[in-house]
Structure formats: structure tokens, C-alpha cells
From Swiss-Prot:
Family to which this protein belongs: Belongs to the bacterial ribosomal protein bS20 family.
Protein keywords: Ribonucleoprotein, Ribosomal protein, RNA-binding, rRNA-binding
One of the protein's GO biological processes: translation
Gene Ontology CC entries for this record: cytosol; small ribosomal subunit
Listed SUPFAM superfamilies: Ribosomal protein S20
Organism (species): Metamycoplasma arthritidis (strain 158L3-1)
Region of interest (Disordered), ranges: 67-87
Designated name of the protein: Small ribosomal subunit protein bS20
Gene name as annotated: rpsT
Record-linked Gene3D superfamilies: Ribosomal protein S20
GO molecular function: small ribosomal subunit rRNA binding; structural constituent of ribosome
Protein's job: Binds directly to 16S ribosomal RNA.
Amino acid sequence: MANIKSKQKAILYNQKANAYNSAVKSTVKTAIKKAKLAADQQDAKLSDFVSKAHHEIDKAVSKGVLHKNNGSRKASRLDAYVQSKQQ
């Protein structure tokens, strides 16, 4: 543990930020998995799952958890996956 008070506070802040970022990333991954599963099963609510995944990705990008390009890549790959399963 750090000896300087400001560094102790910084460590606590970083731990909180890490927990938040991990939770948001987990939510994004779960939404993508659900959308892919719906695409595999030809689910009737596929568009709902895909839009939910896009919403979670966009929210993570706007909060600064994911980089803009990373979010775009995730959304693009999800769309390509869904498109390949619909053919």
C-alpha cells in the first residue's frame, strides 16, 4: 500500500473505476452473446437483441469505457455475424 495520502486515494479511485468498467464490459459482452445466440436459433426477437447490444455498446463508448473504434468494431462484427446467419 502507498504511504502518500493522495496515492492511497488514487488507488481507491482506480479500484472503483476498474470495478465499474468491468461491469460495463461484462454487460456489453452478455448483450453480444445473447444477440449471437438469437441469430443462431433464428429467434423472432433477433432485432430486439441486436438493438439492445448496439445500445449497450454505444453507452459504453459514450461513458469512455470503450474506445470509439473498439465500439464500432464490435457493432460491425455483430452485424456481420447476424447477416451471415440470416442467409
